[in-house]
């Protein structure tokens, strides 16, 4: 069941809300449950303007480690997606007891591609957000160093987008 105002995923499966999605809803954060992944991890979509609030709540629920942040392109004319994989980490926790959740933010390609940086909550998001910016052009508001990480600063375009057109030339540089 899709909630009003949330960007649509290309996956049209209807999913019953999971526990974390229900908790976010109870805390007043609009979200949409997406189908669980192949190993049963709950996937949730949130609006860009609610990302920071949703992640703050996840941190309060015990999800204290950002395991991975990245992006992907659903295809030409479709959404760009920023995803976040959170886990619980505890000194005395058994590996089979680790809780996991994945948040996704769907951004329309022809709209504003800006979302809040999570650097203030998770310092480890620094280079991950920079790489996502570098490869997909998703801007992270309030990031402390919003520069390219892998490509030269003067590079044009976003190489991992599916509509990216590779330049016909490469400028060779002297080794001296």
Curated annotation (Swiss-Prot):
The keyword Lipid metabolism does not apply. It is found in: Cellular thylakoid membrane. It is an enzyme of class 7 (translocase). It is a peripheral membrane protein. Pfam families: Complex1_30kDa (PF00329). Its EC number is 7.1.1.-. Residues 20-32 have a biased composition (Polar residues). GO terms for molecular function: NADH dehydrogenase (ubiquinone) activity; quinone binding. Residues 1-32 are annotated as: Disordered. Its main location: membrane. One of its GO terms (cellular component) is plasma membrane-derived thylakoid membrane. InterPro entries: NADH_DH_suC (IPR010218), NADH_quin_OxRdtase_su_C/D-like (IPR037232), NADH_UbQ_OxRdtase_30kDa_su (IPR001268). GO terms for biological process: photosynthesis, light reaction. NDH-1 can be composed of about 15 different subunits; different subcomplexes with different compositions have been identified which probably have different functions. This is NAD(P)H-quinone oxidoreductase subunit J.
């Amino acid at each position: 069941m899709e909630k009003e105002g949330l960007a649509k995923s290309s996956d049209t499966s209807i999913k019953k809300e999971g526990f974390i999605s229900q908790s976010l809803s109870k805390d007043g954060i609009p979200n949409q449950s997406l189908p669980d992944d192949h190993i049963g991890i709950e996937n949730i979509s949130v609006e860009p303007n609610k990302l920071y609030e949703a992640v703050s709540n996840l941190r309060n629920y015990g999800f204290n480690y950002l395991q991975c942040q990245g992006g992907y392109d659903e295809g030409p004319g479709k959404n760009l997606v920023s995803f976040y994989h959170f886990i619980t980490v505890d000194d005395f926790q058994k590996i089979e007891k680790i809780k996991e959740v994945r948040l996704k933010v769907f951004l329309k390609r022809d709209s504003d591609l800006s979302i809040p940086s999570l650097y203030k909550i998770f310092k480890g998001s620094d280079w991950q957000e920079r790489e996502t910016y570098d490869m997909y052009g998703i801007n992270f508001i309030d990031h402390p160093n919003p520069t390219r990480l892998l490509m030269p600063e003067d590079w044009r375009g976003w190489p991992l987008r599916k509509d990216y057109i590779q330049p016909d030339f490469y400028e060779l540089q002297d080794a001296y």
